[in-house]
Structures are given as structure tokens and as C-alpha cells.
Amino acid sequence: MPKTVLELPQHAGVSAARNRGAEAARGEILFFLDADVVLAPGGMRRVFATMSRPEVGALFGSYDADPDDVSIVSRFKNLAHHYFHQHSQLEATTFWGACGAVRRKCFFAAGGFDEKRFKLPSIEDVELGYRLNGGGVRIVLDPELQVKHLKKWNLASLVATDVVRRAIPWTLLWMEHGRVQTDLNFSYDQRFAAMVSFALLLAIPVALVNPYIWFVVGALLVVAYRLNRGLFRLLLTKGGLRLAIGGFLLQQLYYLYSMIGLAMGSAIYFFRAL
């Protein structure tokens, strides 16, 4: 497949780079791939097949179930992403720039990626998806369109990225648009799972003083497992008990710091409104 490499005069950020690429492209379909992913064989055929349907304006795929880095944090993060994309609604309300296609006319009608707001990698693709969806563009998720993620995560980079570049800007986006998506990892059971995680955080210190509260802790742990049992079974299959237990703990941590990000984003939104 012929390729053209564009060199920008200065570092302008991920959104600007994608927009310049879209402007230089000549085809009807724009296909975005992150630099740290590898498209699975047959991926382009799936893109062409889905985008040949005139009612589809955009589509995106998923990470595969075999991430490149085998550390617990990296495997948990990538497998959690894989799991939620594999079990979400096929009719989507957002977009994913790591592996996503959009009709050229729809992309430019929506204004492309927001270069002023998102210079660093963040939720620029999600925000574009909101505008596409708000403009009546049909976006579909194809779970079989998969890429292997090559990124290595550690705990510090995971928490910092999820809070600063995801939870906070995502909260601002929700408030600006007046609606919260209900697919992917924002389904109602995931919101309930976050509340269970918070209840665990409160119950465990109390149980250290009052042993009877350990029954409450046990019940909450069962509920926490049940709410994400599919994900934990996937982790067990891919990495054994060590990854399953580590993933369970990381998932509870994810809920807690995401709620902190939600609170911070809400505070920023209301202070801006003053």
C-alpha cells in the first residue's frame, strides 16, 4: 500500500497531526491508527466492508487479548479495554482514534479533532465522537477489528493518565453536553461497581475496629466480583491467579481514582462557570 509521510514544521500535538493527515488524504474514508498499535491481519478488509455500508459514518475497533507488554499493570489495562469493547453496544456514541475510520465528509463537517483543546493525547477522539453523534452520524463498534497495543504501563503512568487526561476532561465533556454515555465502561453496572468500591474503602477501616463489619466487607467483595466476573475470568485465563487478583485490586483502584477525577472535573466546571 503506497504511503506518504508528512513532516510538520513544529510539534503541534496529536490533534493537529491527525488533522493535517486528514487534509492531505485523498480518499473518501479516513482511517486513524495510533503509532503504538499493530493492526491485525485482515483489518483493512473489515474497515472496507463496514464502511461500504452507506448508513455507517464512522467505526472503531478494539485492542486484542494479547498485549505486547506482559507486566500486570499493562496486561490489566489492555485486557480491560479489550473486554469492555468486546461486550459493549455495537451502536456507539463515541469514537476511538487508536483504530477508527470515519467518512471524510463527516469528519470535516464535524470540525475534525479539536487542536486547541487537545494538544496532548487525551480524549480528543471521544470529543470528536460526541460531535459526530450529535450531528446524526452513525458510529459502530466492530469488536473483530483489532489491534495489538505495544505501550508499556506502570502504576504511576496509569493513574496519572486516567485521572488527568481522561477522567477530568471526560467529566467536563459530559457537563458541557449535558449527557453521559451509557456504553463501554460507563454502563450502569459499572457505575454501581464504582459505588461498591467506594463502600469497600469505607468498610475496611471500620472492620479493623469492629470485626462484625468483616461480614459487610465479604459481601461487598462478592458483589464487586460479580459485577466484573467476565473481566476477571479473562484475566485468569490470560495470566493465571496472579493477574486475576492483581487485576481485581487494580480495578477497584481504577474506580476510586476515577471518582476523584470526576470530583475534580466537576469542581473545575463549576469554578469556570462563576
Where does each model-flagged region fall?
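Conserved nucleotide-sugar donor-binding
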Residues: R26-G27, C99-G111
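Conserved donor NDP-sugar-binding/catalytic core segment of glycosyltransferases
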Residues: V38-V73, L150
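Short aromatic/hydrophobic "clamp" motif used to bind/position activated sugar donors
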Residues: L30
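Short, flexible, basic/aromatic active-site loop/helix in glycosyltransferases
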Residues: F60-Y63, R75-T94
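Acidic donor-binding segment of Leloir-type glycosyltransferases
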Residues: M1-L8
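Glycine-rich, basic loop-to-helix element that forms the pyrophosphate-binding segment
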Residues: L8-A25, R46
